[in-house]
Curated annotation (Swiss-Prot):
Post-translation changes: Autophosphorylated.
Functional summary from the UniProt entry: Member of the two-component regulatory system HptS/HptR that regulates genes involved in hexose phosphate transport system in response to changes in extracellular phosphate sources. May act as a sensor protein kinase which is autophosphorylated at a histidine residue and transfers its phosphate group to the conserved aspartic acid residue in the regulatory domain of HptS. In turn, HptS antagonizes CcpA-dependent transcription of a subset of CcpA-regulated genes involved in antibiotic susceptibility.
Any one GO CC term of the record: plasma membrane
Protein name stated in the entry: Sensor protein kinase HptS
Catalyzed chemical reaction(s): ATP + protein L-histidine = ADP + protein N-phospho-L-histidine
Gene transcribed to yield this protein: hptS
Signal peptide: none
Ranges that cross the membrane: 20-40, 222-242
EC number: 2.7.13.3
Membrane association type: Multi-pass membrane protein
Keywords of the record: ATP-binding, Cell membrane, Kinase, Membrane, Nucleotide-binding, Phosphoprotein, Transferase, Transmembrane, Transmembrane helix, Two-component regulatory system
Residue positions where Phosphohistidine is found in the record: H325
The organism of origin for this protein: Staphylococcus aureus (strain bovine RF122 / ET3-1)
Lineage of the species this protein comes from: Bacteria, Bacillati, Bacillota, Bacilli, Bacillales
GO molecular function: ATP binding; phosphorelay sensor kinase activity
Superkingdom of origin: Bacteria
Length: 518
């Protein structure tokens, strides 16, 4: 029985495909969905933050513009050469600055005067010039510049969401940045990969506020996660393959057992009933196999018994068909001898009784070759009484050959055929030569009788294959059919003859089956 188990392999592949690949697809879909949702949320957050920051800056700008408009007349009455007016101006400007939701610095510059709240002397080049205004004072006109260093909202966005702010002009020159990776005054070149950003217009000068986020760290985290997932997937594949193989073995164990039992049943080695290890619907198939095997065995035994009986009947029938004409002729001879030579008639009766005892023996269909030869000698002796000792019988055989076992009445028909068809007015010499070779007994029966013509020889050869009960020609046909029944195709019978030269019959009997009582 072949060791290849395609059903187990198919089941293992199916289990593997139905468990590992769905898990893998779920993980991949989950990861892609996670990043898609993450990108969508970040875009939404950036959009919200940039709009909030724009509103905050617009509010500051509006507050400053309102302040300038409201205090324009009062500034014209102040003289910045006067110490008290300078203090009043500082107080108003600081009040404006402190009211705004941003870190602002102002610079008020004019003739021989410079006022600022940048007491720490921070570099205003790193700040965004929020607005510029000309203020008229009593003694002269001054320039007011307001710088934005930061806003609480931008700081909160930077801290909580790691989103950074840029302000650029219409030529994309960076005017403000709360990220050290950008330098004020340089061109802003947005990155195509690893960054998310959104911009809005701030003022009539076409300055734009840009909120952006660097997602390289998230991508690196994603790559790390992918590596971890790949390792987990490899382990999952190995575990899944082993699990699928074990599960396939468990699921197909009973099926393989049933296939093995079918193989044993086919070779008639099934044995007694044994249930399957697992209680399942397959037990019905298992029961059916044993029932079918038992029915098949009973049928085979019945057929074998019938065949044996048929062979016995055929052999008996064949053996009986050898006798009638011989018995009739012998009885006529005895009748003739009773009046002519009672003593010789008594001898013939004794020989005939021994022959009948031999041929009617029912306990076995096999005999020693020596017994068959004795039977033939008695048969020839009776025939010589009829034909005035015209028949000369010569037997050439070794002692070893004489003790071999053959089927009963396997040689007598050859002698009967030689006497019946070879005898003429002259004497008839019959030679029986027995030799052993390769577990076969080779029998050569040669006579110097009248022989056969080519057409007659062809007819006799063809008649050997006729059915034993259909042909009218007994003798060799019966012997050939009996040999086929008892020995099968291993037995061989060949006939050679020439007109007026005699007949030679070569007969091969397998000794390996001759010892079997059929």
């Amino acid at each position: 029985m072949t060791a290849y188990k395609p059903y187990r392999h198919q089941l293992r592949r199916s289990l593997f495909a139905s468990t590992i690949f769905p898990v893998f697809l779920v993980i991949i879909i989950g990861l892609v969905s996670f990043y898609a949702i993450y990108i969508w949320i970040e875009h939404r957050t950036i959009h919200q933050h940039v709009n909030e920051s724009q509103s905050s800056l617009h509010h500051i700008e509006k507050q400053i513009q309102t302040f300038i408009t409201q205090h324009n007349n009062s500034f014209q009455e102040l003289d910045l050469t006067n110490h008290h007016d300078v203090t009043a101006t500082k107080r108003e400007l600081l009040k404006l600055i402190h009211q705004q939701p941003a870190t602002l610095y102002y610079e008020l510059s004019g003739p021989n005067q410079f006022i600022t709240n940048n007491y720490e002397h921070l570099n205003t080049k790193n700040m965004y010039l929020f607005s510029t205004h000309q203020l008229k004072f009593k003694n002269s006109t001054y320039m007011l510049k307001i710088y934005m260093a930061n806003t609480p909202r931008l700081s909160e966005i930077k801290k909580d969401s790691r989103q950074f702010a840029l302000i650029v002009d219409r030529y994309d020159n960076i005017l403000y940045a709360n990220d050290d990776r950008f330098t004020i005054g340089e061109k802003y070149r947005p990155q195509q990969f690893g960054f998310m950003n959104e911009s809005v217009k701030l003022n009539h000068a076409n300055h734009r506020l840009i909120i952006y986020k660097d997602i390289h760290e998230n991508i690196e985290d994603g790559i790390t996660l992918l590596i971890v997932m790949a390792v987990v997937l490899v382990l999952l594949v190995i575990f899944g393959f082993i699990s699928a193989d074990n599960m396939a073995k468990r699921q197909t164990k009973d099926i393989e057992t049933i296939i093995q039992k079918i193989y044993y049943a086919k070779n008639r080695h099934l044995g007694t009933y044994t249930p399957l290890k697992n209680n399942s619907e397959l037990e019905e198939i298992n029961n059916y196999i044993y029932d079918l095997f038992e029915s098949n065995e009973q049928l085979i035994h019945s057929i074998e018994h019938t065949e044996r009986r048929l062979r016995d009947i055929q052999l008996k029938e064949i053996e009986r068909q050898f006798q009638p004409h011989f018995l009739f002729n012998t009885m006529q001879t005895i009748q003739y001898l009773i009046t002519l030579s009672p003593k010789l008639a008594q001898t013939v009766v004794q020989q005939l009784s021994q022959m009948l005892r031999y041929s009617l023996r029912t306990n076995s269909h096999t005999v020693e070759l020596n017994e068959e030869l004795n039977y033939i000698e008695q048969y020839v002796a009776i025939q010589n009484i009829r034909f005035d000792d015209m028949i000369k019988l010569h037997i050439e055989s070794s002692e070893e050959a004489r003790h071999q076992t053959i089927g009963k009445m396997m040689l007598q028909p050859l002698i009967e055929n030689a006497i019946k068809h070879g005898r003429d007015t002259e004497s008839l010499d019959i030679t029986i030569r027995l030799t052993l070779a390769r577990q076969n007994l080779h029998v050569l029966v040669c006579d110097n009788g009248i022989g056969m013509s080519s057409s007659r020889l062809q007819y006799v050869r063809q008649s050997l294959n006729n059915d034993v009960f259909d042909t009218k020609h007994l003798g060799l046909n019966h012997l050939h059919n009996k040999a086929m029944i008892q020995y099968g195709s291993h037995a061989r019978l060949h006939i050679f003859s020439k007109r007026n030269l005699g007949t030679l019959i070569c007969y091969k009997i397998p000794l390996s089956r001759g010892n079997v009582d059929v």
